Amino acid sequence: MERRIYSAFVALIPTHKIILVSGPKNSGKSAFIEGVFSENNLAYQKIELGEALIRQEINKLSLAELLWLANQSDHMLLCECEHLALLQEFLDEVLNGKVNASIMLTAANPPDIEEELLEALAYQGAHFYLPPPTFYEYTNETSLPIESKGIDQRLIYGNYYSLNTQKLDKQEGLNQTINNIVSANFSASNRINKSEVLLRTIQVLANHIGQPLSYNQIATIIGVDNETIERYISILCKSHVLYRLPSYSTDKKYELKKTNIFIFLDNGIRNASINNFNDLLMRMDIDALWMNWLIAERIKWNKINNVMAEYFFWRSHTRQQVDFIECNVKGMEGYKFKYNKKKPLKKPPLFQNHYPDIPVHTVNTGTYFSFLTKK
């Protein structure tokens, strides 16, 4: 499968010393880069810092030894670079001309790289985001009719695997990804004291999918303090597991304020965390799964296309709601999601009274593709 970022990535290799590809665990970042190298006959060396033994040996090296190693090939691929102890010092020397090779970095968790360098990479277009293949990318690989028939599978198993992957293989792979997320060796600035609390946080959010929650509510359910929950959720967002939608409010009457909805950036991860791979006919959370999948796909579409946007939800104390609000340079638009296209959705009159200039659209199984790919 040719990923959406392929052409832009290949174009940067001859001119950039450092390229960073970030994205969720097991999303194919290293495989993508290795595929690019292979297809373009580029010599490279790969260091898999996600492997504990390799990480231990590499982190024993001095900076001088690390620089020597980097110069043994035209290109160096540092997988899960967040685990490299001397990462910032190494990159400083790369930029100072001490390394002839180009350095390709992958990261599933936030690496300890100075903000100025991260901003420079983003400005130069050298920081790519690579999630599991999006629905759009799958349709390019197969066809829209084929992928549309598999929507139910996407709601259950997410986008990590193609439609023809066996269900048991999907479940096993997703469970392993959850284990990898919970047991991740995060950087010192993103410490996790108790992995069981991290897993419990994920499970609570999974069980309240699509529901407004405050940090205090989550902390009360789990039995820990607010600061811990806020920090753990921040790490999960930075690690591409969650996306936080804050409530939209301009202090109008009856509006819900200071709460969040947490979106899982892959439905399969959400369902694996609570071990629920039941078919849709056996579920009570179909609309929540539909909403989560659509919002996650929309956010990923914008990110891989470098579209800057902000996202919100809206609720009132009188139970009126807009599931998703997108704000970009073209303006603001609201959306309500319903899996069953035969059931009409009413637009919330309170929202329309407060914000008559923000249109509200309905997205169902008959109208979703234009929403996912809207530019």
Where are the regions that the model predicts?
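Interdomain hinge/linker elements that couple catalytic modules in large macromolecular machines
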Residues: 129-272, 278, 282, 288-291, ...
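Conserved Walker B catalytic segment
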Residues: 82-104
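Short glycine-rich substrate-engagement loop in P-loop NTPases that contacts/grips substrate
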Residues: 45-72
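Structural recognition of the conserved hydrophobic beta-strand(s) that form the central parallel beta-sheet
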Residues: 77-78, 102-109
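Catalytic P-loop NTPase motifs of RecA-like helicase/translocase cores
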Residues: 53, 82-86, 112-113
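Short regulatory helix/loop adjacent to the ATP-binding pocket of P-loop NTPases
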Residues: 111-125
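Conserved P-loop NTPase "ATPase switch" module shared by AAA+ and STAND
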Residues: 69-87
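A cross-kingdom feature that marks ATP-driven nucleic-acid transaction machinery
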Residues: 2-6, 13, 17-30, 35-42, ...
